[in-house]
């Protein structure tokens, strides 16, 4: 059996890792969708699709998990989004999502949809991790060490801080 899960993975953290590991116990292969792949260089989506692929690939490297990583664009046309996903991915039977819209769209197309159990959601939140990065607080223990390496390699902290800078034009 092959399953699909989509997320923004901004950044890929230990909560995401636990969900992927749990799904891998239930299916033979996982298709990991890089959602909103066209978005990057913003405070909510600071990392590119390629950087997120690096994070996930390196973090999963030590596990015996069969997976594909597929970038998925936002198309702002919900009625055809599932068809778009289907055209980009290998066939799959099951969708794992905690997102109510994604759940509804795939359910309407008769997919088996499961809601993964979130792993310590208060602690493992991309939003909170990005806030810690911005404030100069400790964030490294929330993500796999391979993700720390990628973020340091691409100067992800510097990028987030630069994105938060205010230009003089903002004050006039």
Swiss-Prot record:
- Which pathway or pathways does this protein act in? Cofactor biosynthesis; NAD(+) biosynthesis; NAD(+) from nicotinamide D-ribonucleotide: step 1/1
Checking SUPFAM superfamilies in the record gives:
Nucleotidylyl transferase (SSF52374)
What cystine linkages occur within this chain? none
Q: Which GO terms describe its biological process?
A: NAD biosynthetic process
EC number(s) reported in the record: 2.7.7.1
Q: What is its main location?
A: cytoplasm
What parts of the sequence cross the membrane? none
Identify the enzyme class. Answer: transferase
Q: Which UniProt keywords apply?
A: ATP-binding, Cytoplasm, NAD, Nucleotide-binding, Nucleotidyltransferase, Pyridine nucleotide biosynthesis, Transferase
- Descriptive protein name: Nicotinamide-nucleotide adenylyltransferase
Q: What is the lineage of its organism?
A: Archaea, Methanobacteriati, Methanobacteriota, Methanomada group, Methanococci
* Matches recorded under PANTHER family: BIFUNCTIONAL NMN ADENYLYLTRANSFERASE_NUDIX HYDROLASE (PTHR21342:SF0), PHOSPHOPANTETHEINE ADENYLYLTRANSFERASE (PTHR21342)
- Reaction catalysed by this enzyme: beta-nicotinamide D-ribonucleotide + ATP + H(+) = diphosphate + NAD(+)
């Amino acid at each position: 059996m092959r399953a699909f899960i989509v997320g923004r993975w901004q950044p890929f953290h230990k909560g995401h890792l636990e969900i992927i590991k749990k799904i891998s116990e239930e299916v033979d292969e996982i298709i990991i969708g890089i959602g909103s792949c066209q978005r990057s260089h913003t405070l909510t989506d600071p990392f590119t699709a390629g950087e997120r692929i690096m994070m996930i690939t390196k973090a999963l490297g030590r596990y015996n998990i069969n997976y594909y990583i597929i970038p998925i664009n936002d198309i702002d046309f919900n009625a055809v989004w599932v068809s778009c996903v289907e055209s980009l991915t290998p066939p799959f039977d099951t969708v794992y999502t905690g997102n109510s819209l994604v759940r509804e769209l795939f359910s309407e197309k008769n997919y088996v949809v499961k809601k993964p159990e979130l792993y310590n959601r208060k602690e493992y939140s991309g939003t909170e991790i990005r806030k810690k990065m911005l404030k100069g607080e400790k964030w490294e223990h929330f993500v796999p060490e391979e993700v720390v390496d990628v973020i340091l390699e691409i100067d992800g902290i510097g990028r987030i801080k630069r994105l938060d800078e205010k230009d003089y034009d903002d004050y006039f």
